[in-house]
Amino acid sequence: MKKVFYSLFAAFVLTACGSEKQAPIDREALVARNNPQVASFDSLASLSVGNGEFAFTVDATGLQTFPSMYSKGVPLGTQSQWGWHSFANPQGYKSEEVLKAFDFGRGHEELYACQFKEEGRQKEASDWFRVNPHRLHLGIVGLELGEGVKASDITDIRQTLNMWKGEITSHFTLNGNAFDVRTVCHPDQDMISASVTSRAHAGVNLRFPYPTGAHADDACNWDANDKHSTTIVRQDAQSAVLKRVLDETTYYVTLRWEGKANLAEKSKNYFVLTPDEDMLAFSCLFTPNFQGTVFESEPPVYADGQVLPSFTETAAASASYWTNFWTNGAAVDFSHCTDPRAGELERRVVLSQYLLAIQSAGSVPPQETGLTYNSWFGKFHLEMIWWHQAWQPLWGHTDLLDRTLGWYETVEPVAREIARRQGFPGVRWMKMTDPNGTEAPSNVGSFLIWQQPHFIYLAELVYRSNPSDEVIQKYNKLVQETAEFMYAFATYDEFHGRFILKGAIPAQETLRAATTINPPFELSYWHFAMQTA
């Protein structure tokens, strides 16, 4: 029966999409016909450039000129994998304070990180650990168009995201002056480069917010200037370095511009780069550390700063990276399909690859909202990595998944401690977490288990794309440690002579851990992972 079904299905696909022998796919044409186009200010139509480690999202001007207009839609984020912050902890909350003991009939006590709801220190502690750390908005980079200019003053908007090159081109008119903006992201640095051409000599502003610590928002608190600072620590005729200090968090913003321009502080945490010419080209790099030498004096001297790539160099690097991305790996051309849904399906396939490559392919697992804005305080959920990244080895981009899986090794000691305090060997992968592997307290997340087999599944995908001893040696230790926990977590049912799963909340998150036995998805996934390991 299965063979008959698959034969009929294949015949249907070939009929719908044309069964005649096709020439090789014109990949550039495939990508180009799906390039997003924007012709107005639309808070749900922001565009992004990025590299998996860093992403920069813009409005219809090609930069982040009107962030408040987009804050309730798809916000104009500047986010990285390293940019995190924690509010002060004067009460000295400790992670042990959010642990609660449970007995699920496995012969030992199990300690889970819970979210306490009753007023008191435990609630305060669990609230603090859920909020902290949170991901930072690293800074707004927008056009300085003049006092009182509104989005409604701008006309003749024509904007395109060229996914083949990773470049956003934006054209618009303001007060009779035409503006042309090109925006790119460097493939190997947390840096954007842009060129702005206009007879209006419009400047570029850099504005820096304090974090909100909110569950889901653009992470921009513009009413807390007294809680953070931005200072120019190094400047010459073509570059400057700004130092950001937010509580215990410090990072740096390095600028390089071409031609004559002047950088000045307009107000606290607000700087403007003003050109003397019709074109302003600049690069803006965000780093956790100063890229040079710091001489500890009073005040400190910042020397030998990094010389940033120019706009032209960054645009060339971006085009090279994206051309290579699209040229290699899988591609599907739906242009010969007669089904009326084919065009939309093709658009989603192409755009999804671009978005997931810039938002969900970094050195740590992806946030559910990528690097655009904060959800769940900017933290990532390990059960969701499958949706973001399982496609990568299947579509010939194994290297993207490979660099993310390395994170699991760095947090292995944390995962081992979670398993230990619950009375199990091996490692138990956390659900809601951050780059350090800190387990966020939750009355649901801490009891989920469907994230546990993911590591084995994803490592298997890497192996299938490159079946070698090298891959086995790289991942086998963590695969076995993951399986060791899974074996111990399963309870032997002596009456029925079988192993069962209990004391866990299923993926749909509505059932209770104390009364759930053998959730079918988790049970089948456990079986697959144990066989694979």
Could you tell me what each predicted segment is?
Residues 15-16:
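C-terminal motif of bacterial Sec signal peptides marking the signal peptidase cleavage site
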Residues 19-379, 398, 408-414:
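Acidic/polar, glycine-enriched structural segments that form the non-catalytic walls/loops
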Residues 27-29, 35, 206, 369, ...:
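Beta-strand segments within the central parallel beta-sheet cores of soluble alpha/beta enzyme folds
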Residues 349, 382-427:
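Carboxylate/His-rich catalytic cores and anion/metal-binding grooves
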Residues 356, 385-401, 453-468:
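Alpha-helical support elements that line or immediately flank enzyme active sites
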